[in-house]
Amino acid sequence: MACNPDFVQFIIDQCSGAGEIAVKKMMGDWCAYCDGVLFGLICDNNFYIKVTEPGRVLLKEVILRPPYDGAKDYFNIRDVDDREYLSSLIKATLPALPKAKVKKNPMK
């Protein structure tokens, strides 16, 4: 089941207190980025955040499940109505995630 575009926009708006939120569509679902760092997924009208210890400490309810078949477990975030909670959770999660590697242009 694909995500409802209104739900995707709602998640973007709810997370905006954490930084610059962007999403990219990938195979019917959405990857969520904050300040250029991939931190979560929006799949089947569910919001998932990558598993980190700083994030676990702030979770109101720890629900681990894969967002799609064959994926690693993510935190399944049920309370998406609390904007401050989501922003705090993302801000705590980001420093524990690897930064994107800068791609170098190969010399020809």
Spans of features found by a protein language model:
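Charge-dense, helix-prone N-terminal extensions
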Residues: 1-108
